[in-house]
């Protein structure tokens, strides 16, 4: 029976049958990360485990497929493919001889079931690419080494030792399918299942290939050149058609999805296409104004600080942010001003600041009434006693 060949999809993902979509997605991500072939290079079974997890997720993440699976189990794969109710589309029984004809049509034979030995598309792969902020902002070209499953060169995908051939499966007679008969109130119900001996292949390998150990497929590393466009950010996905795992039995290869992860930068904070950086100036520079050099992604640049600049003020440098992923041009760089107050002052610096405070009529620590009067007297003397 098929139950021996295929595990329950809920069991594979480790979730209850009433699991929510979010719980199913979370379980899939955790298991996919754990059993990804890239992270299990020394485990030859990781690729099959990863494929099993992906197959379970493809069904349970789709509401229609999940509903059919909950009702029919793995037999849902044989009942109308991507369709729903196998009786859907028939308005009545006038064109048929009776109930026996109808049941024979739907349940009576394997001729109308899909061929389990047909071409199978290769699995999609996902690769996380780490980038610096500058690489993400301007774009770059990266050469990746991506593990993927391909046909074995020794046996050319047959799984059999060179000089031998797979033999016809004795259980299904080479059809790849077996019939399971059930008796219901309507009569006999014949369900066509995938053969658990050959797993739908129709043939079995008696003398396995020493290279792939009878699997017909091996894991290799392919070199892939990726052109990363400017403006990508963490989570951006690039699709490379045909760079996934090789298909089975002449099926097309899957796709490779490159997922970007941009490393944090100690100088810049990113918000969309704009960048933010903080630069420090003295309180005297803030009061009187100055010109300072700041870092940008393009290199150092001189900016003007206007007099009277306050802490937290921002100076915008247009076109100095990241490239826009969609559209042309670049974002802006926002320079946030931080004003530093000196921790220690020389005696002369202190005197000068006290004089400034007196001129502005501000009372500060260290200013005595006598000092304040003495300073005012000096000012009057300087102005001719007026």
From Swiss-Prot:
CXXCXGXG motif repeat segments: 152-159, 169-176, 195-202, 209-216
One function term, GO molecular function aspect: unfolded protein binding
Domain of life, source organism: Bacteria
Positions annotated as zinc finger (CR-type): 139-221
PROSITE patterns assigned to the protein according to its UniProt record, in alphabetical order: DNAJ_1, DNAJ_2, ZF_CR
Cofactor, free-text remark: Binds 2 Zn(2+) ions per monomer.
J domain mapped to chain residues: 8-73
Named cofactor requirement(s): Zn(2+)
Subcellular location: Cytoplasm
Binding site for Zn(2+) 2: 169, 172, 195, 198
Family: Belongs to the DnaJ family.
Quaternary structure annotation from Swiss-Prot or TrEMBL: Homodimer.
Job of this protein: Participates actively in the response to hyperosmotic and heat shock by preventing the aggregation of stress-denatured proteins and by disaggregating proteins, also in an autonomous, DnaK-independent fashion. Unfolded proteins bind initially to DnaJ; upon interaction with the DnaJ-bound protein, DnaK hydrolyzes its bound ATP, resulting in the formation of a stable complex. GrpE releases ADP from DnaK; ATP binding to DnaK triggers the release of the substrate protein, thus completing the reaction cycle.
Domain notes: The J domain is necessary and sufficient to stimulate DnaK ATPase activity. Zinc center 1 plays an important role in the autonomous, DnaK-independent chaperone activity of DnaJ. Zinc center 2 is essential for interaction with DnaK and for DnaJ activity.
Protein name per UniProt: Chaperone protein DnaJ
Species for this entry: Symbiobacterium thermophilum (strain DSM 24528 / JCM 14929 / IAM 14863 / T)
Lineage of producing organism: Bacteria, Bacillati, Bacillota, Clostridia, Eubacteriales
